[in-house]
């Protein structure tokens, strides 16, 4: 009997993953890919709310499920104010911040908004968990070269923490016992140093680090300043170059790494150079995080959708295997991790945090 139905919603930069769980048992799931031309018509992720909500509605209809059948809805957490990890109720103050348009423009802001919309009519709880703004930085990691622009902790925290726990458990350890470098490779890339249960450093995938399928990553600053001051571009146009139209999209016109591999196999040398350059930058960021951990690295974990790629993974491994063993956990643990958070919240309301 499906008496603990939980709907899980995970909006990413280029996809929306939706799943129906009965407790921790996944009953149904769908991974909807949003191609770059579809998303190009939206000036921000917030503008995609109706578009992404429709995808969730359609999934529920396909599964012959209504919100009234659910016990709870949980969405991926967005770039809110710095928070501790855990599960949060989607209440008025959290909604206000998500709807403000003042947050970092990331698809994860839609997780709580969609969850709340689904839950509202059915009068069931809506949650988020381990939002991208979980902040466990050492103070030294916050310092940039300009006092008014500190480095921020914004990352794919949910999947990183889930895969750290999984790999540690497979080795008879707890997250508090190990030092891992985790490269989350999705539409955006987060490369994190995880020391004894804390994520002490990570690149902000919107601002810096390797370029990715649709983000520009670290760019030459003087060139970027010249573009910004040229008068040719509005702010939103420049932002879209950095987040949404950058990376593989800018170079090759697609955010789909599988398509790029097909081009390479057909003899496209430009596609090979660009994809290998992306792997090169990922490896370089992993090397940087090894210095954060002072070389005391138990394992390097590659996770996310791009960790399935038959070209990218070997290119990374050949550059970083000298640091530590490389463990590949393709795909994401985020759906199950969110479902587990919701189960714990339903079982013990005292663990649910208010924003």
Language-model-derived ranges and their functions:
Residues 60-107, 125, 133-144:
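Short beta-strand-loop/turn "lid" adjacent to the catalytic site in phosphate-handling enzymes
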Residues 310, 314-340:
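Conserved phosphate-binding/catalytic loops in two-lobed NTP-binding clefts
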